[in-house]
């Protein structure tokens, strides 16, 4: 059975810097029976962090797009993510809009969110 994952920005950053948490992402990426998705908003988040830290933006971008299927956002996904964001903010004041996009993509693809972010615990 194929397992499906959406990797959020937190997990991608951990993977890119090679932490123990990032090793879990690496283990998923090495498996053959997985489908891995990344929201286009997450790509922007990770690329922004790389740029701010003086890292090779093209290399970071290539790693994300080579290792996952990037899901572009449209008006319907944006509407769902907006409603989800509003709902989640009722109980978690620092739940980010990018997190809402990742969770929306996970729900649409019936995937598990791969993250270290406490919002998803």
Regions found by a protein language model. Give the residues of each.
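Short active-site oxyanion
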Residues: 2-3, 32-36, 67-69, 107-112
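Histidine- and aromatic-rich ligand-binding microenvironments
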Residues: 7-8, 38-39, 95-96, 117
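A general structural signal for well-ordered alpha-helical segments in protein cores
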Residues: 22, 43, 61, 78-81
